[in-house]
């Protein structure tokens, strides 16, 4: 519990969101969250033994006053790392990759450009224990991120390692960019195709896509950045999915049904994740004590503000509502 003194250092909007009386229903909490300044949000809840529940509030499109739709596509950003980690695990079980092989084994040309390439293993990259700097931490990357996203390694070449391999932890998007490149190289075709064949098709995830070029933009929730009028829907940020598709995948990840025999035992990564790109923030969580998956999509971001912290408070309150309703 925070002390009164420590609350002086917490922005009032976060204190308010935290101390408000807990509503009785998830929809009331969604409506309350919109009152905190979010443009729009979607919630998907999968409680074991119950049909999935969908909630939405605010705007799908602010300019045209189109209400949020729980079936809209959303840019899931780093939640996609879970799909990559599962794919790497499957390829290791198939003996097409090895967790113990190094970055230099797969890409010798990176020796001298990425420090410790000869010592960094695939498993270290999966677990963010490689020490490879995060290209999105480089301010120059964001000066033209749509173009720079096509060549992210240029923003980490010749930088010092954050730490010696396997001697620390630092979340780095570079790890997963490299893992996707390694999958592409080993397979001779795209990691997206592999994910589709081995994860999306078996789980019947028909509303998960890899690019805005694969879908009708009208099906995508608009994305906003605080203080900017622009809708970021047309920016390319990789994977898109409905909240339901993410929820089905997360359930399969946690109950093991996404894996074939012998794969879950060697899976080395997380079982839930968040995602954040301009205009889109997402959280996908599994709560074992109530056997419930909760997916939250919010289409308002501010990298210098409190929107991410606020989103975490909101999902925590939603989980508490579900937990309280289970116990009554």
Task: Place the predicted regions along the sequence by residue.
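Bimodal feature
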Residues: 25, 46-51, 69, 114, ...
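Short, flexible, mixed-charge acidic loops at enzyme active sites
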Residues: 54-61, 218-224
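Short, surface-exposed loop or secondary-structure junction motifs
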Residues: 115-283
């Amino acid at each position: 519990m925070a002390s009164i003194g420590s609350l002086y250092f917490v922005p009032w909007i976060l204190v308010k969101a935290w101390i408000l009386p807990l509503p009785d229903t998830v929809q009331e909490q969604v409506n309350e969250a919109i009152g905190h300044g979010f443009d729009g949000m979607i919630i998907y809840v999968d409680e074991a033994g119950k049909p999935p529940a969908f909630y939405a509030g605010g705007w799908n499109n602010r300019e045209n006053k189109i209400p949020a739709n729980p079936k809209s596509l959303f840019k899931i950003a780093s939640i996609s790392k879970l799909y990559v980690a599962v794919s790497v695990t499957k390829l290791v079980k198939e003996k097409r990759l090895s967790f113990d092989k190094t970055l230099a084994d797969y890409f010798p040309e990176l020796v001298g450009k990425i420090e410790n390439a000869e010592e960094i293993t695939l498993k270290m990259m999966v677990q963010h224990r490689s020490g490879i700097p995060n290209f999105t931490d480089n301010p120059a990357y964001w000066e033209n991120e749509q173009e720079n996203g096509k060549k992210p390694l240029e923003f980490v070449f010749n930088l010092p390692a954050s730490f010696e391999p396997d001697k620390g932890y630092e979340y780095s998007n570079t790890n997963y960019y490299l893992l996707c490149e390694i999958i592409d190289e080993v397979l001779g075709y795209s990691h997206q195709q592999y994910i589709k064949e081995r994860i999306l098709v078996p789980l019947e995830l028909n509303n998960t896509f890899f690019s805005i070029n694969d879908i009708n933009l009208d099906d995508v929730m608009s994305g906003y950045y605080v203080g900017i009028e622009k809708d970021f829907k047309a920016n390319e940020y990789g994977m898109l999915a409905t909240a339901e598709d993410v929820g089905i995948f997360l359930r399969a990840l946690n109950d093991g049904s996404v894996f074939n025999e012998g794969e879950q035992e060697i899976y080395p990564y997380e079982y839930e994740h968040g995602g954040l790109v301009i205009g889109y923030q997402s959280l996908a969580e599994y709560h074992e004590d109530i056997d419930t998956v909760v997916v939250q999509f919010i289409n308002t971001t501010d990298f210098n503000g409190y929107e991410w912290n606020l989103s975490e408070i909101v999902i925590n309150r939603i989980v508490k509502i579900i937990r309280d309703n289970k116990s009554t």
